[in-house]
Amino acid sequence: MCGIAGIILFDNKKVNREKLIEATDVLKHRGPDAGDVYIDNESIPRVGLGHRRLAIIDLSESANQPMTNENKDVWIVFNGEIYNFQNLRAQLGHGHSFVSNSDTEVIVHLYEQYGEDAISMLDGMFAFAIYDKKTHKIIIARDRTGKKPVYYYKDSHKLIFGSEIKAVLKFLERHEIIMNEHAIPSYLVYGYTMPAQTFYKGIYRLDPAHYMVNKQNGSLVIKEYWSLKSRINDVSPNPVHASKDDPMLRLKLADAVKKRLISDVPLGAFLSGGVDSSIVTGIMSKFMNEPVKTFSIGFSEDPDYDETAYAHIVAKRFLTDHHSFVVTPSAIDLIDKLLYHYDEPFGDASAIPTYIVSQLARRYVTVALNGDGGDELFAGYQRFIAGSMSESMPGLLRGMFYDFSFLIPEQKRERAIPSRIKRFLKELKYPFIQRYLDWISYIRLDAINTFVKPELLYRDYKEEIISYFDSHIKGIEHASPLTQLLYINFKTYLPDDLLIKMDRMAMANSLESRSPFLDTGLIEYAFTLPDKLKLNFIKTKYVLKHTFKDILPRQIQHRRKMGFGVPLAAWFRGRLKDYAAGYLNSNTSEIYNYLNREAVNRLYEEHQKGMADHGLKLWLILTLELWLRTFKKGSEI
């Protein structure tokens, strides 16, 4: 893992070396081992590339970046890992001269030989920029699922890119740094911005499975190089692999884990005690010659959020070298640090334990495998149960159940079963997509106008959000409702929340995180499996649990899914109570330039009185307030 940054100037201005170094070094947490820059101020456009290195493969200085070929006419800055780099190197024809054993250098020569087609040949997680001096092109690419981030800013004079927004901001003048107020509604609904936008006007995320080509004249083209939709459309209606014990699944996941054990530094695994991380740990233990170092985290004050007992069961089963940590409410002291690493407000409070478990792991290893992606591929979330169940109901029955929802009283805890049933029933009156959107929302789409000031709600904002999600179904209308929901989740929540969180929190601690479940071959295979093998009535991840039943301890196979959350309900009635009040009830609160004070105060009071659990909503609003204060000061986020 590393950090990349760069600037391309289309006019006669030259790249400022000091500013390029500053933009690169602001990413030092992503790459503490080495850093350097490359500048070409002789050509048009002018090009500056910066790199911070976290050494994982080939620890020698010869693998440092920016890196070039033997002719010095192809340059690269690269963040990530390419798992098939040794095979690709062997496939390259004669005439290539290597100075290192790194995967980065293979990309350089692969581009020399295949041009843009080289991108689709890469198996791994990556974000990189290539400067082709012969054609004066800049190519910036991102991996298929979005494990590695790329942000960019472009106007008529320049193109700027970076692994994090903070690197992009270093190149901008203060008058160019403008808040994107239109990001607030989608943030309040889902906890992240979309599509591809950020809280800064003009700064965007490059979509996963896409690359951009910037030509000498400044024209920019963005292309998609991989599409999961085409795989979904190739699925046979009567697949031959319809067994709950699936040897092909076993083979593909084992291969995905094995290739992610390539490393010249110590590695381990995050172990929550859930199905996915337990399977990954079990497979690792078969391939490694020493005990797997595993890391888990829990919450002492709320058993609903504490999985450490399950993690210990798995650790004992595989004789791992296990380390655990208990999070206390004092973890809120990390909020400012997390905001710095996110560069934006963040709605997913599980960033806190993710940061802490990454910090714990980094004491012992430089690489950690995780279970991310298992829920996304094999229908592990309750939203998939709700979606499939509701779509199978006749319309009249949905209407009856919707009326019944008003008989269920509000609960003090969001995770309480009556709360979940009430939420499920309340959304039954809506069309399929909006039903799903409201189930995954923090604040329901229809309730946003209660919180956000009218002048901020641009016309058709609601339709725009719905149509964005709806657009993901175009081309796979024939697929089952479950497949459609899995695909939407794969294209939105996975890259825009889950993977951003894992990247930021791991890299904040100079830790590389690898996700075997997000292996391309496994993803494509999983989407060919019939629904009944993923969701068997209300049994989630059905085929996964059965295929690996010999690995999974019985207690893990049949345990209730807890999720990697934070006890916000208790925190906002305890340690966070006065902290939140100090920011949200102040005369200097920034959020009330955008939100209605009365609506926010009502949330806070209802939560404190135990009338409802608004912990998730309060976290969303609190982090927005903290970010706004920092932004208004003009200091770096």
Language-model regions, residue ranges each:
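Active-site adenylate/phosphate-handling loop in enzymes that bind or generate adenylated species
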Residues: 144, 356-420, 493, 498-522
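Adenosyl-5′-phosphate
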Residues: 1-4, 22, 117, 176, ...
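Generic hydrophobic alpha-helical membrane-span motif
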Residues: 37, 149-152, 279-282, 377, ...
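Cysteine-centered catalytic environments shared across enzyme families
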Residues: 1-342, 354, 358, 550, ...
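Short, basic, helix/turn surface patches
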Residues: 129, 347-358, 397-403, 586, ...
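Short beta-alpha connecting loops at secondary-structure transitions
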Residues: 297, 344, 388-392
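Generic recognition of stable, solvent-exposed alpha-helical segments in well-folded globular domains
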Residues: 18, 179, 244, 248, ...
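Alpha-helix capping and helix-loop boundary segments enriched in small/acidic/polar residues
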Residues: 302, 326, 345-348, 412, ...
